[in-house]
């Protein structure tokens, strides 16, 4: 069955925003990230950055355990389809394939070099095919076989008085033996009704137990004990004819001593996947083989069981490459599977790199595919062709993670660990900057956290700009100003402040802008923000009853010609309110002492300044109105593109002019009276 197919991609890496990976798979990738980070921590604390065999094995087992947990969760999952439309069973089959490959690479790579390869492969087979019913898809079928096949057979046979009378009993025994699963064969033989009294059965059980012990002992550097036991079996069958009354026990003996005809006969009968029985073939016929001899051994095996290399699926080709100790070819097949295998290839290559950095050097891996990473790398470095496979895979995987709205946060870990230095940081800067946070301010804040952690200046400014503009469109001017203040430039701060001064929010709301309480000296360089801060202070002083101080600040705002006309209208309204308050008894004064009911005191020069400012503003408004009326009939002013388009339509301009004129007419006599009172004082 073709497992690595670009038609069956996992959701990670899907270019479609609607295609998201299954929640269980997402948890798996988070688990892998935690193990990845742990591996980096271990490598950094070791001289040379190379993880010892024991450490690499521990990390490898953790990766495999994470895949197995995901498989168990999928078995318990009720949904038949993932959110990307993928069949849950199909996803389970893919994870089974990856589990099989990872454990096989672990068996042939993270092992003492002096150990016999046959024992490591037998352990791999026993772990992956515990019932010899493959946990991965059969080559002959399109469905997962029952992983508890042997347990089901045993449960049925236990209820029978004579299990050996049933064909399924001996089929199970011989199939287990074909795979060199001696423990299962021994267990099944014990269900034989005559087991306790039959000398041949007892003898066979003892032999199988001895074989099992001899193979999986602590010292795995030789198979002398196994060869001695096999010679003993030859003697029992040839000379003593111990098993002549038990045809099936005779088959077991024939397999054990390496009879090719028997092996082929039962392989053709049961038709298991070739890689399930290859470790047994290696034990029965070439137990002392080394890694260098494996290609020749496999050729003999394929000739015996009539398997053709050109008919192998991509999964089988990958397994074959690994068993032949051609791991580079195996990695090429894995990497060529596309995005579906990227997460698997990335973590596998990373672990191999830190176990032996020379093994995956750029020369050996230069021809290995790396998806879309190369194009991205080319845009950041002229020497990108010299980057090793690990770096290229980490970049590609990070790209894919940024395409999933719940996995993007872990992408930074991979880019920073890529060893690309400033190139990796610039790539991360671009990916964060281009990430679509869909107007979610919570996501934007998390992106900004990444920017601060890894000093991503460009991305930080882009996100803040987008955030400010979005809040302005939503009318959230106070929040927009708060985010604009976090930018390195004053451009947006100036624009947002000016729009607030022009009336984007009410004067009372300006007095509630608590962001000014936490400001430092950064607003000194922005005149618009200074005006806002002064007006905020003015409103706060009014609320606190500090009229004298409030009037002095209002005076400063009044004589500042940098503020927009709309803001002057606001100042007029505030001045009118204050002057009106002078004509009312002030709250809090003692009504029994009316002589103390005096105004807070308007300074003569202060009133004169306000009067002059009012006159100049009135004259300016008249000139602007005249120019607008005369120019409007002759030409239409070409619109200019601005960050915040001003509200400068003809109707709004006329309305504002009329409003300012009315306010000035109201304010002028009040200021005149206030000035007269000052002179009378």
Q: Where is each model-derived feature located?
A:
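Short, charge-rich, low-complexity alpha-helical interaction segments
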Residues: 100-155, 340-369, 429-444, 505
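Solenoid-repeat scaffolds in large eukaryotic assemblies
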Residues: 184-186, 330-333, 345, 361, ...
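Short helix-adjacent coil turns
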Residues: 50, 54-57, 61, 65, ...
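Extended alpha-helical solenoid scaffold regions that build the rod-like backbones
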Residues: 170, 241, 245-467, 570-571
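Extended amphipathic alpha-helical scaffold segments
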Residues: 156-214, 315-337, 395-419, 430-431, ...
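Short, charge-rich amphipathic alpha-helical segments embedded
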Residues: 192-216, 331-358, 419-437, 488-507, ...
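Long alpha-helical scaffold regions
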Residues: 1-7, 12-15, 19-61, 67, ...
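Long, acidic/serine-threonine-rich intrinsically disordered regions with weak helical/coil propensity
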Residues: 1-132, 287-344, 383-407, 420
């Amino acid at each position: 069955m073709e497992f690595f197919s670009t038609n069956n991609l996992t959701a990670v890496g899907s270019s479609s925003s609607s295609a998201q990976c299954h929640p269980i798979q997402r948890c798996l990738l988070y688990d892998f990230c935690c193990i990845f980070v742990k591996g980096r921590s271990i490598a950094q604390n070791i001289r040379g950055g190379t993880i010892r065999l024991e450490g690499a094995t521990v990390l490898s087992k953790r990766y495999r355990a994470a895949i197995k947990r995901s498989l168990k969760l999928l078995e318990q999952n009720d949904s038949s389809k993932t959110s990307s439309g993928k069949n849950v069973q199909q996803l389970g089959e893919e994870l089974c394939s990856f589990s099989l490959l990872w454990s096989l690479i672990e068996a042939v790579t993270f092992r003492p070099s002096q150990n016999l390869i046959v024992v490591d492969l037998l352990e791999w087979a026993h772990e992956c095919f515990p019932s010899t019913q493959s946990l991965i898809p059969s080559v002959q079928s399109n469905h997962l076989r029952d992983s508890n096949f042997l347990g089901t057979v045993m449960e049925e046979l236990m209820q029978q008085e004579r299990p050996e009378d049933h064909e399924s009993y001996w089929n199970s025994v011989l199939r287990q033996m074909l795979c060199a699963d001696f423990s299962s064969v021994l267990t099944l033989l014990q269900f034989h009704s005559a087991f306790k009294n039959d000398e041949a059965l007892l003898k066979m059980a003892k032999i199988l137990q001895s074989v099992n012990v001899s193979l999986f002992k602590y010292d795995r550097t030789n198979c002398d004990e196994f060869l001695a036991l096999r010679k003993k079996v030859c003697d029992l069958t040839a000379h003593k004819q111990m098993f002549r009354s038990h045809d099936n026990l005779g088959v077991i003996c024939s397999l054990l001593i390496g009879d090719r005809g028997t092996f082929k006969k039962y392989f053709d009968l049961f038709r298991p996947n070739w890689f399930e029985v290859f470790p047994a073939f290696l034990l029965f016929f070439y137990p002392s083989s080394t890694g260098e001899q494996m290609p020749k051994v496999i050729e003999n095996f394929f000739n015996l069981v009539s398997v053709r290399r050109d008919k192998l699926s991509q999964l089988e080709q990958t397994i074959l490459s690994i068993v032949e100790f051609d791991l580079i070819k195996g990695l090429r097949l894995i990497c060529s599977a596309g995005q579906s295998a990227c997460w698997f290839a990335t973590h596998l290559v990373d672990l191999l790199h830190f176990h032996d950095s020379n093994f995956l050097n750029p020369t050996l891996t230069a021809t290995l595919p790396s998806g879309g990473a190369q194009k991205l790398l080319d845009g950041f470095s002229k020497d990108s062709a010299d980057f090793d496979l690990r770096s290229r895979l980490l970049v590609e995987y990070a790209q894919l993670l940024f395409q999933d709205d719940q996995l993007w946060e872990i992408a930074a870990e991979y880019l920073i660990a890529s060893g690309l230095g400033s190139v990796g940081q610039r790539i991360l800067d671009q990916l964060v900057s281009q990430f679509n946070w869909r107007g979610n301010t919570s996501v934007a804040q998390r992106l900004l956290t990444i920017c601060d952690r890894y000093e991503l200046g460009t991305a930080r400014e882009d996100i803040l700009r987008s955030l400010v503009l979005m809040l302005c469109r939503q009318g959230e001017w106070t929040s927009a100003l708060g985010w604009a203040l976090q930018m390195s430039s004053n451009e947006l701060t100036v624009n947002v402040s000016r729009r607030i001064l022009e009336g984007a929010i009410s004067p009372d709301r300006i007095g509630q802008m608590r962001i000014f309480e936490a400001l430092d000296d950064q607003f000194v360089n922005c005149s618009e923000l200074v005006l806002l801060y002064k007006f905020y202070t003015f409103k706060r002083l009014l609320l606190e009853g500090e009229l004298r101080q409030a009037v002095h600040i209002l005076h400063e705002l009044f004589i500042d010609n940098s503020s927009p006309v709309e803001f002057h209208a606001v100042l007029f309204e505030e001045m009118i309110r204050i002057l009106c308050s002078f004509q009312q008894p002030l709250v809090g004064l003692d009504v029994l002492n009316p002589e103390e009911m005096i105004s807070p005191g308007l300074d003569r020069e202060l009133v004169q300044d306000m009067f002059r400012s009012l006159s100049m503003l009135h004259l300016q408004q008249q000139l602007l109105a005249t120019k607008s009326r005369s120019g409007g009939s002759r030409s239409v002013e070409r619109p200019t593109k601005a960050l915040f388009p001003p509200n400068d339509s003809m109707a709004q301009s006329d309305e504002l002019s009329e409003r300012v004129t009315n306010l000035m007419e109201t304010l002028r006599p009040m200021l005149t009276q206030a000035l007269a009172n000052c002179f009378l004082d």
